[in-house]
């Protein structure tokens, strides 16, 4: 262990970490496969399809059904409150900044479309299943729980 005037190696590293300035917000500009958001928004759909992942390319190359077409119309238009049951629409750069409410099977979950979501499905950002929270055993689950008082 090397000890010098400033202290041990560990304390020197700790001081160096603390002295670094913490940056707030986004440290670097958003880019998707080397393209900025502005460049992506200026691209035609054919150019954009070439840089998207295979699953998104395949989905966009096929014709959309009626529900998907209606949702895309709303997303590209000037609608304020967009509620939908359609979860299988690929997020495109023109949708960035829109606020969408997607149905999860029970209620609508509201979120804003961010640049990092490009190329993903709408349904990926709304969970359909609740997180399991285990508690004590139910009535009749064990022999001793038969005699537990109900709430």
Curated annotation (Swiss-Prot):
Biological process according to GO: ribosomal small subunit assembly; translation
Gene Ontology CC annotations of this record: cytosolic small ribosomal subunit
UniProt region (Disordered), positions on chain: 1-23
Pfam families hit by this protein: Ribosomal_S19 (PF00203)
InterPro entries in alphabetical order: Ribosomal_uS19, Ribosomal_uS19_CS, Ribosomal_uS19_euk/arc, Ribosomal_uS19_SF
Assigned keywords, A-Z: Ribonucleoprotein, Ribosomal protein, RNA-binding, rRNA-binding
Gene Ontology terms for molecular function: rRNA binding; structural constituent of ribosome
SUPFAM superfamilies: Ribosomal protein S19
Transmembrane residue ranges: none
Taxonomic superkingdom: Archaea
Basic residues bias: start-end ranges: 11-23
Keyword Manganese belongs to the record: no
PANTHER family documented for this protein: RIBOSOMAL PROTEIN S19P FAMILY MEMBER, SMALL RIBOSOMAL SUBUNIT PROTEIN US19
Protein task: Protein S19 forms a complex with S13 that binds strongly to the 16S ribosomal RNA.
Family: Belongs to the universal ribosomal protein uS19 family.
Protein name: Small ribosomal subunit protein uS19
Natural source organism: Thermoplasma volcanium (strain ATCC 51530 / DSM 4299 / JCM 9571 / NBRC 15438 / GSS1)
The encoding gene: rps19
